[in-house]
Design a protein with these regions (language model features):
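Short amphipathic alpha-helical recognition elements used for nucleic-acid or partner binding
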Residues: 9-41, 61, 187-195
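DNA-recognition element of transcription regulators
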Residues: 14-22, 47-68
Length: 266
């Protein structure tokens, strides 16, 4: 997380300041109540003077955000009867730009523009992986709840983008990325299926089958379940070398994407 104003770095360094600012940004232009601040900052064990501490943090945060110009900061971080509100203009928050690019990328995929859509989704994902993801800010229950749907949406967009790139014949370029993604979630069936296909198309049948066995083991150990029928069908096709798994011969998205696994979430 970073904050800049006219080229000057205004990013808070103290963990509580960063956490408070993250909560305000995730609720930009909306009032964050004192109760919400207390729950986020201290969860189940607030100090006796938690409300007073919040007021102090806000005062300090105002100074940080505007280099000591508290009068200016009060116009940005506004006091309300129930709590505080952070005013954010259009284009100021990277999260909003990230979400805009995500929507535009998906729209391009829907319109049959896989190359342009995939590029835009990659740009959006790079923004999230860089500064938008709040990776260096502490997160309490409210921030975790706010970030969860964004992370789900990000994963869904990644699956769609890779789906398009596989259909464009970019399997070799995708192997390393898919290995890293699957390593982060060993039970994710769609990403594993995409990894299996990318490996198979890259001439690595044994590695593709090994990816299936790792998925089956992880699902059994972590979720007490087994891979779905689509993954089993893909595994059979890999074992038999079914022609439908062959990579596309042109740089255009084929009329049918049956060769690219699209699994239905349980």
């Amino acid at each position: 997380m970073s904050v800049t104003e006219n080229g000057d770095d205004r990013t808070p360094s103290a963990p509580k300041h960063r956490q408070m600012l993250a909560l305000l940004l995730m609720n930009a232009n909306q009032v964050v109540s004192m109760a919400q601040f207390v729950e986020e900052l201290w969860e189940y064990s607030p100090p006796p003077r938690a409300v007073a501490a919040v007021h102090t943090y806000v005062m300090q945060l105002r100074r940080i955000l505007h280099g000591g110009a508290t009068a200016v900061a009060c116009g940005r971080l506004v006091t309300r009867e129930q709590g505080y509100l952070l005013r954010v203009e259009d284009g100021e928050l990277d999260l909003h730009l990230y979400e805009s690019r995500l929507r535009a990328g998906r729209a391009l995929l829907d319109a049959g523009e896989p190359d342009a859509g995939a590029r835009l989704l990659r740009t959006a994902d790079a923004m999230w992986s860089g500064t938008t993801g709040l990776v260096d800010a502490p997160t309490g229950p409210l921030l975790r709840a706010a970030l969860a749907p964004i992370e789900r949406e990000r994963t869904e967009a990644t699956v769609r983008r890779i789906h398009a790139e596989l259909a464009l014949g970019r399997h070799q370029e995708l192997v390393s990325e898919l290995c890293a993604l699957v390593h982060q979630d060993l039970t994710h069936e769609e990403l594993t299926a995409q990894l299996m296909l990318a490996l198979y198309r890259s001439g690595r049948q044994a590695d593709a089958l090994a990816a299936f066995h790792r998925l089956r083991h992880a699902l059994r150990e972590d979720l007490a379940t087994t891979p779905g029928p689509d993954v089993h069908r893909l595994t059979t096709d890999i074992l038999t070398g079914h022609p439908r798994l062959e990579p596309p011969t042109t740089g255009h998205l084929p009329l049918t994407l049956d060769a690219v696994p699209t699994l239905v979430a349980a």
